[in-house]
Regions:
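Canonical positions in the second alpha-helix
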Residues: 53-54, 87-88, 121-122, 155-156, ...
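Eukaryotic alpha-helical solenoid repeat scaffolds
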Residues: 167-340
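Register position in tetratricopeptide repeats
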Residues: 40-41, 74-76, 108-109, 142-143, ...
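Canonical tetratricopeptide repeat
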Residues: 33, 67-70, 100-101, 135, ...
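Short coil turns that delineate tetratricopeptide repeat
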Residues: 59, 93, 127, 161, ...
Length: 340
């Protein structure tokens, strides 16, 4: 009977231990939940206290460590967050969140080399974590490593095509490399996602600057085209000529009408202005898409839509009168898949 007694005693002990462990886990989850709610209310010290209670019960809690770091960063103490993030990474080495936040902290603290180190470590650990590619693109851009910024932005777009900021950093990086056609299509892609946000006017300013690059109206019927020496052998060469010819024989055009004609003419030669022979992604995702758009009959609606931040009242009135055109454009967007 002694072995049986010992077995029963052991089973009872295990049952008690499992129950206690389960209760502790539930308590930790509840404390973290309370901490998150307090953080959302801006009660950062109270939130941190809740996380500290959770960590006393379960020091190996990934969520408690990560949320502590998140709240410390929100509180304005990002460097204090790093030890908690390092702990979180040790607990879950394949999670991209921790690497991403540490990278952000170092980048904000003007330590780009450390930021790049953690973004790269994060990419190695979590290769499908989209924000790592976006953030490393931003850091590369800040370091004037525009080729690397473009490449990372492309990966970020592949992982999340609807992430407007990735479209934006692609447009900025290509612009810095004087790839004006690719930059134009990047900005237009951004504006398809964010036609009316605080960032939209800046994007539209870039678009207009690219379209008007080298083109100067010198009189009512005269235009001067200036070709920069660095554009003589590049994909930018045809852009000012195309833009000028698009409206040269037209009269009494509104700003949006002119823009529509200019967009259409440029998109029709999208593969030329992007010089995408050696960049399959740009050729498929950008050039093919915008070339199809130019031929779709939806250019007026497209132009009105992406220029809402500049001509809001006029464009909204146009959409009210042309609701079928807006619906047709929306249907076309849904039906037209952008390939990588």
């Amino acid at each position: 009977m002694k072995p049986l007694y010992k077995t029963l005693l052991l089973l009872a002990f295990v049952a008690i231990s499992v129950t206690a462990y389960s209760q502790d886990r539930d308590k930790v989850k509840e404390l973290i939940k309370q901490g998150v709610a307090l953080n959302d209310e801006g009660k950062y010290d109270d939130a941190i206290a809740k996380y500290a209670e959770a960590l006393k019960i379960e020091p190996g809690s990934y969520n408690a460590n990560y949320e502590t770091a998140y709240t410390l960063q929100a509180k304005g103490k990002p460097l204090d967050a790093i030890p908690y993030l390092e702990a979180a990474i040790k607990i879950n080495p394949e999670s991209g969140d921790g690497y991403n936040m540490i990278g952000n902290i170092y980048d904000d603290n003007k330590q780009p080399d450390k930021a790049l180190e953690y973004y790269k470590r994060g990419i190695a650990a979590a290769p499908d974590y989209q924000r790592l590619y976006y953030n490393i693109a931003v850091t590369y851009y800040g370091q004037k490593q525009y080729t690397d910024a473009e490449a990372s932005a492309i990966t970020a777009i592949k992982l999340d095509p609807k992430h407007a900021s990735s479209q934006r950093i692609f447009a900025m990086a290509t612009n810095r490399q004087n790839k004006l056609g690719a930059s134009l299509l990047g900005w237009c892609s951004f504006l398809l996602i964010e036609p009316q946000t605080k960032r939209s006017p800046e994007a539209l300013t870039y678009v207009k600057a690219i379209i008007n690059n080298g083109v100067k109206k010198t009189g009512e019927k005269s235009v001067t085209i200036t070709i920069n020496e660095k554009d003589l052998s590049s994909s930018n060469l045809l852009m000012p000529l195309t833009v000028t010819n698009a409206t040269s024989d037209k009269k009494n055009l509104s700003a949006t009408d002119s823009l529509t004609l200019q967009f259409t003419a440029l998109f029709e030669i999208a593969h030329v202005i992007t010089g995408d022979k050696d960049n399959p992604f740009v050729a498929s995702y950008y050039s093919d898409f915008f070339e199809k758009l130019a031929k779709s009959g939806n250019m007026a609606a497209f132009t009105r839509y992406i220029s809402l931040s500049a001509y809001k009242d006029e464009n909204l009135a146009w959409f009210k009168e042309h609701d079928k055109d807006l619906a047709a454009f929306d249907d076309w967007l849904k039906a037209t898949k952008r390939e990588f």
